[in-house]
């Protein structure tokens, strides 16, 4: 998701999206610890997505 798309969302939507991404990040880290995760780059993508959302929320 691009920053432009994130800026078009409402603050409430961004908070919900951030919670969903944090849950997904938790699950991916859990899978990584069990050795089940094959695409480790997904963790980095989600962390950056969360950072983008938090940055835009702080701008408001």
Curated annotation (Swiss-Prot):
GO BP terms in the entry: translation
Q: What is this protein called?
A: Large ribosomal subunit protein uL29
State a single Pfam family of this protein: Ribosomal_L29
Q: Which keywords does this Swiss-Prot/TrEMBL entry list?
A: Ribonucleoprotein, Ribosomal protein
Q: Which NCBIfam families match?
A: L29
One Gene Ontology molecular-function label: structural constituent of ribosome
SUPFAM superfamilies, per this entry? Ribosomal protein L29 (L29p) (SSF46561)
Q: Source gene?
A: rpmC
> Which family does the UniProt entry place this protein in?
Belongs to the universal ribosomal protein uL29 family.
Kindly state one GO CC term assigned in the UniProt record. cytosolic large ribosomal subunit
């Amino acid at each position: 998701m691009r920053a432009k798309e994130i800026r078009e969302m409402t603050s409430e939507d961004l908070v919900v999206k951030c919670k969903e991404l944090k849950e997904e990040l938790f699950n991916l880290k859990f899978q990584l610890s069990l050795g089940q995760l094959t695409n480790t780059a997904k963790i980095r993508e989600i962390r950056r997505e969360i950072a983008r959302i938090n940055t835009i929320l702080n701008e408001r």
